[in-house]
């Protein structure tokens, strides 16, 4: 996935690939091979009150990590211990061989978002860990490693020292844990042409984040005592869109919710003039594409964003799907979180700005929020942005 400074993040998700084979990153062009630093013993390591992370409570010192992602981590199971010490993170890998290795038998290759650790054994270079999806960016030139008995210790300096890493790699578990500190309670809206896709992706997100799942289709049908299809036949799509807009207004003050919106022409999100209350949360546009490669999908999304012919182009992030399989809903949800993570990291003031927008009444002045007392119906000229 590519991320752009304009705030548009795009994920291209192909069913022929494993979930999130590309993700939003602001990549550094430099790639370095870190230099080893060998210490004589554990006492040489300056500890900084690191805590041990475990997604599940495991009594052993080491967590067992297994991943089948094509571009996340090598498929072999590895034992590791991960700690986040603020500005730095530390990874401890248990070496496969029982012999004491010399630095020349170890290879550590790192760049801004990737890490490859290999061990020479019987003349062969064995991969201990290989990922191009570290949870976030590191400073490659600050990476050091050393051997401590039967463990390889890799110490990396984070680019963003304030961001807490739940784990060394970006995964569903680390994203759902890490996004809580970034979202700060802000809600998420899933928009796009397919109501079914919106529903399934939003449910996965709600479960993962511990948010409340809300479905505008279910709310509308419960209120009207009829199906959406019957409503459209009886009163037309405009009536349904207006009704959903009212529902979104009532939900705009809610926090920690994932809202699934109606797809198609009868959905409010597809209409550019109905986004006043959608701006209260982070919006993810899930869109199917016939593009056969990531670059084509990015260009397609970029054109849609620039032309603004449909309401979906107002979304904060875009997830492009090459085909759809309901069993892959969690993969799309993970891709959505990855894009949102990069968006918020690029501008950490966004959650607070969303909150301010809600407090001022969701007046439609996103992203250039006007001062208190501004009335869109009597606006006669430009106003300074209120932050």
UniProtKB/Swiss-Prot annotation:
What is any one of the record's Gene Ontology cellular component terms? chloroplast
Region entry Disordered, spans: 368-387
Q: Which CDD domains match?
A: p23_NUDC_like (cd06467)
What domain of life does the UniProt record list for this protein's source? Eukaryota
Keyword Mitochondrion assigned to the entry: answer is no
Keyword check for Cell wall biogenesis/degradation: no
Q: Which cysteines are joined by disulfide bonds?
A: none
Q: Where in the cell is it found?
A: Plastid, Chloroplast
Q: Where is the transit peptide?
A: 1-71
Full protein name: Probable inactive shikimate kinase like 2, chloroplastic
Instruction: Give the organism's phylogenetic lineage.
Output: Eukaryota, Viridiplantae, Streptophyta, Embryophyta, Tracheophyta
């Amino acid at each position: 996935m590519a991320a752009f400074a304009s705030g548009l993040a795009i994920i291209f998700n192909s069913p022929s690939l494993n979930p999130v084979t590309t993700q939003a990153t602001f990549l550094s062009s430099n790639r370095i091979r870190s230099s080893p630093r060998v210490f004589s013993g554990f006492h040489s390591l300056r500890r900084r009150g690191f805590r041990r992370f475990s997604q599940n409570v495991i009594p052993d010192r080491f967590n067992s990590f297994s991943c089948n992602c094509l571009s996340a981590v090598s498929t072999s199971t590895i034992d590791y211990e991960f700690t986040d010490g603020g500005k730095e993170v530390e990874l401890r890998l248990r070496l496969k061989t029982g012999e004491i290795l010399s630095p020349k038998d170890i290879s550590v290759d790192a760049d801004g978002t990737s890490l490859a650790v290999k061990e020479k054994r019987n003349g062969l270079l064995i991969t201990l860990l290989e990922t191009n999806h570290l949870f976030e960016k590191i400073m490659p030139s600050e990476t050091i490693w050393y051997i401590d008995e039967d463990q390889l210790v890799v110490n990396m300096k984070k680019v963003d020292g304030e961001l807490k890493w739940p784990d060394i790699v970006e995964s569903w578990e680390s994203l759902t844990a890490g996004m809580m500190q970034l979202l700060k309670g802000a809600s998420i809206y899933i928009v796009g042409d397919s109501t079914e896709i919106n529903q399934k992706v939003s449910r996965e997100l709600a479960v993962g984040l511990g948010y409340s799942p809300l479905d505008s289709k279910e709310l509308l049908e419960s209120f009207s005592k009829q199906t959406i299809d019957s409503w459209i036949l009886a009163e037309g799509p405009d009536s349904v869109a207006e009704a959903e807009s009212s529902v979104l207004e009532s939900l705009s003050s809610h926090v920690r919710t994932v809202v699934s919106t109606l797809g198609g022409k009868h959905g409010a999100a597809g209409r550019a003039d109905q986004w006043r209350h959608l701006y209260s949360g982070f919006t993810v546009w899930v869109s199917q594409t016939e593009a056969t490669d990531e670059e084509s999908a990015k260009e397609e999304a970029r054109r849609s964003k620039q032309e603004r012919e449909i309401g979906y182009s107002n979304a904060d992030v875009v997830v492009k799907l090459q085909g759809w399989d309901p069993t892959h809903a969690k993969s799309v949800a993970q891709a959505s979180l990855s894009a949102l993570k990069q968006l918020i990291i690029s501008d950490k003031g966004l959650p607070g700005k969303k909150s301010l927008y809600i407090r001022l009444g969701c007046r439609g002045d996103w992203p250039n929020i006007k001062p208190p007392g501004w009335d869109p119906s009597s606006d006669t000229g430009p106003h300074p942005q209120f932050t």
